[in-house]
Amino acid sequence: MQNRQIIEPKRSIDVIHETDVLVVGSGPGGLSAAIASARCGVKTTLLERFGCFGGNITVVGVEGFAWYRHEKTVEAGGIGREFEELAKEMGAAVPESQSLSYELDSEGFKLVADKLVMDSGIHPMLHRSFSMP
């Protein structure tokens, strides 16, 4: 098969924001990466295409991540556990019926995510998409 190329014309793009770390997508992985980065003192921007943080958990209503804890669970703690504890404090979580965890609905997840993003000093950019120039 012959290699083909797409040639893009030169264009000027205005710079609207500068950052050290850009995290694209705010699902559980993106949120954790952005929070960890910001807590290290790095200028961090979190970009999300929808109007709220959380990815599929909040936009589609996919089941949350805090359902796994049982009596013999070995757990590392970390941001996921911190997220669950903050949700309990904020009244955004209820005991999960099949485990020792707490479950968060998508609306509760949004509230907790917003608080963690703002408290961590992350620069949020909602309703944005990313493309390479």
Predicted features and spans:
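Short Cys/His-rich Zn2+-coordinating modules
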Residues: 6
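Conserved N-terminal/central alpha/beta ligand/cofactor-binding core
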Residues: 2, 10, 16-18, 36, ...
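N-terminal Rossmann-like FAD-binding beta1-loop-alpha1 element of flavoenzymes
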Residues: 21-45
